[in-house]
Amino acid sequence: YVDCNDTYAYDPDAAKALLEECGYSAEELTFSMRLPKSYKEYVNAGQIIADALGKVGITCNVEIVEWATWLDEVYTGRVYDLTVVGHTGRLDPITLLARYGSESSENYFNYSSDVVDGLIADYRGQLDEEKRAEDVRQIQEQLAQDVPALYIQSPVMVYLADAGLEGFVQYPIDIYEFKDVKLQA
């Protein structure tokens, strides 16, 4: 894991300056944000983002759509400017990172990078764990530089268990493995 959380700090003044440097006045920019209705945390996050964009003068029109519409039009059809959705990882990091491959059917970001494509291919053909870890580190750093998606939050998970529960492992992703779980009397 490479901590890239501080790559882009919240700085409205810097955002305005960057827009100006790129030849935009913020008032000229309008985006639509399509959010899946059935996921309140995504709707809430989207509304916060729209508000933050408004503070630098960018108009963001929020459209809340049914989950089936989001899947069909945003995820599959890629008809959107902005969206908010959650992604869960897997124990093998390439399962999540491979969606950034140029040819991936899950690449609804429409991201394309020869560097990332090469690192994904190298990872998949590599047996050396240290080299695989280096490939993952480089993919994460490239994604932090290119910003095809901006990860903004990680929901807190709370687990309650009987004191006799043994073998339960809490992962930082939505994976629950119960093969070693036992309840002692």
Model-flagged regions — what are they?
Residues 54, 58, 75, 88, ...:
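Hydrophobic alpha-helix feature that most strongly marks membrane-spanning transmembrane helices
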Residues 7, 41, 62, 66, ...:
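Alpha-helix N-cap/loop-to-helix boundary motif
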Residues 1-13, 24-27, 74-79, 95-125, ...:
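Short, solvent-exposed loop/beta-turn-alpha elements that line the ligand-binding surface or hinge
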Residues 1-51, 131, 138, 184:
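Append "and occasionally in soluble cytosolic enzymes with long acidic Gly/Pro-rich linkers
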Residues 47-48, 62, 95-96, 105, ...:
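Extracytoplasmic/cell-surface-exposed regions of Actinobacterial cell-envelope-associated
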Residues 12-19, 43-46, 50, 67, ...:
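Extracytoplasmic/secreted envelope proteins and their assembly/folding machinery
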Residues 22-41, 82-86, 127-163:
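Bilobed periplasmic-binding protein-like "clamshell/Venus-flytrap" ligand-binding domains
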Residues 51-101, 135-136:
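Periplasmic binding protein-like
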